[in-house]
């Protein structure tokens, strides 16, 4: 009795090993697409091969042709009255787990199979979790017809869902590839906005594009691959270009399209245009001492980082004369934080190392008067500030930093407990008497981007609110903070004009990628302007 049972088990195992067949009974059809035989100038090609009719299958057919298919469920493949024609039959395979299958196409004489747009060699399918598009391209001849039967063999057919249509799963490819928003910036007069997009293709290659749109109408008025930014006044944008005569700076008026040459032969270094558009502040690099090839030398731990020994200094480039003069000199780097609205003062920061105690890096803020070339200290040797900007009248400075910054004036924890160094808060410092006013001492969320609005004298900022980046408005006159309701969970970037009541911002939600909006700062209502991945996710 044991032998028959063992034999039956072996038979069952062989059946399971062979897998089960899933017939594809409904297909999407597009065609026919007539193709012609090429003109024969020679009997063989450069590889001494004669022409083969099957090579017509290598004719490129755009995937866009599959957008309006017909439903086909017959046993005989559609033909054509043309001598030769190409036809496309397609279906989808959806699998939520990794799966393997064998694709069988019977009856057709000349055909190729494409999986997600790539030609399949052989008939073995290795399917990652996704909705896959299978396309059979076949060649028909006049007066001849082929039968057609398509099926899948799989050991786990329950993992495969065969169908037609355009609906598909959201997969990792949708996260890694496609178009995203990098930044947005509204013009000083509030009429236009520049939005930077980056598009990532399969394989990792990417490209940037900059679109200028009309804020009121919402339509795109210009597009370029040049990295463009707004001039400090009006609605002109600028960009640089390298020529035989050096690096040149152009400005373009969005409304008229007029392009003006602002400067020629400017240094090939980072720069900031002054608010009155009369000069550039150049950040120049001074190379540090080189390490001896015979000695492996590390001055301090950070010396292991490339470029640590280099220093950054500031210089002023006069756009009228083309003369560049140094603004700062010294052993430690100096960086630009802001320029006053009247272009007469610079807010700069410098840092130095102190490895003997915490914090190990100390930062100082200074106001430089460009007329007298004198400096006024605002903050000295603080290890916890991270950024600073002038107020519009340049009498005060808005500083961001942890609760330990500025002698702990923003600290609200019990004695003996150390605040988080990444808990960013905001402070106002009077330049004359250096009096510090903490603005967000009792505000819990960690502040991210912040902008002082010259239009209504409010501070708009984003903050890390639990698992969201929320948008807020702070009234510096009374300290009131209002959370602005927006339709996205993560507000990734904001921009405000010098005049007007429109804010440009972009963000994403739990179920969608980046979207671009404009917000009325009086009504606090947001209007959707662009959803760059909407078509991709259809």
Regions from the PLM with identified roles:
Residues 128, 184-192, 228-237, 271-279, ...:
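Blade-terminus and WD-like Trp-Asp/Gly-His loop motifs, strongest in beta-propeller folds
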Residues 214-217, 253-257, 318-322, 369-373, ...:
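Short loop/turn segments that connect beta-strands within beta-propeller blades
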């Amino acid at each position: 009795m044991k032998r028959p049972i063992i034999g039956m088990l072996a038979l069952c195992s062989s059946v399971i090993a062979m897998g089960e067949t899933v017939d594809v009974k409904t297909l999407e059809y597009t065609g026919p697409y007539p193709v012609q035989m090429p003109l024969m100038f020679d009997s063989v090609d450069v590889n001494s091969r004669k022409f083969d009719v099957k090579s017509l299958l290598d004719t490129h057919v755009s995937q866009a042709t599959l957008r309006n298919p017909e439903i086909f469920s017959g046993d005989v493949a559609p033909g054509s009255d043309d001598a030769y024609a190409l036809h496309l039959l397609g279906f989808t395979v959806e699998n939520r787990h990794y799966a393997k299958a064998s694709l069988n196409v019977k009856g057709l004489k000349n055909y190729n199979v494409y999986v997600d747009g790539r030609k399949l060699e052989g008939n073995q399918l290795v399917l990652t979790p996704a909705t896959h598009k299978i396309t059979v391209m076949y060649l028909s001849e006049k007066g001849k017809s082929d039968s057609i039967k398509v099926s899948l063999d799989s050991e786990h057919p329950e993992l495969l869902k065969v169908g037609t249509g355009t609906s598909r799963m959201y997969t990792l490819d949708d996260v890694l590839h496609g178009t995203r928003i990098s930044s947005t910036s509204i013009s000083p007069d509030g009429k236009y906005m520049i939005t930077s997009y980056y598009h990532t293709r399969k394989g990792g290659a990417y490209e940037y594009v900059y679109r200028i749109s009309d804020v009121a109408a919402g339509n795109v008025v210009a597009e370029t691959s040049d990295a463009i930014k707004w001039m400090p006044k009006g609605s002109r944008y600028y960009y640089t270009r390298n020529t035989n005569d050096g690096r040149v700076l152009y400005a373009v008026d969005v409304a008229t399209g007029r392009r003006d040459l602002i400067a020629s032969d400017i240094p090939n270094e980072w720069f900031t245009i002054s608010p009155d558009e009369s000069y550039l502040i150049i950040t120049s690099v001074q190379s540090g001492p080189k390490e001896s090839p015979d000695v492996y030398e590390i001055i301090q731990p950070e010396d292991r980082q490339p470029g640590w020994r280099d220093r950054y200094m500031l210089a002023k480039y006069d756009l009228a004369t083309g003369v560049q003069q140094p603004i700062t000199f010294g052993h430690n780097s100096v960086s630009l934080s802001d320029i006053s609205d009247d272009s007469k003062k610079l807010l700069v920061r410098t840092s130095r190392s102190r490895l003997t105690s915490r914090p190990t890096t100390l930062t100082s803020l200074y106001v430089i008067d460009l007329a007298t070339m004198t400096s006024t200290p605002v903050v000295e040797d603080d290890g916890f500030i991270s950024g600073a900007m002038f107020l519009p009248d340049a009498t005060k400075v808005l500083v961001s930093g942890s609760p330990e910054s500025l002698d702990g004036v923003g600290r609200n924890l019990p004695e003996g407990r150390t605040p988080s160094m990444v808990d960013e808060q905001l402070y106002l410092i009077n330049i004359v008497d250096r009096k510090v006013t903490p603005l967000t001492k009792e505000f819990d969320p960690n502040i991210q981007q912040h902008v002082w609005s010259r239009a209504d004298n409010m501070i708009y900022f984003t903050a890390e609110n639990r698992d969201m980046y929320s948008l807020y408005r702070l009234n510096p006159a009374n300290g009131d903070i209002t959370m602005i309701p927006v339709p996205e969970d993560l507000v990734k970037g904001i921009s405000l004009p010098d005049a007007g009541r429109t804010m440009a911002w972009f963000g994403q939600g739990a179920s969608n990628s980046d979207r671009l909006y404009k917000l009325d700062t009086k009504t606090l209502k947001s209007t959707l302007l662009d959803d760059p991945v909407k078509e991709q996710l259809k």
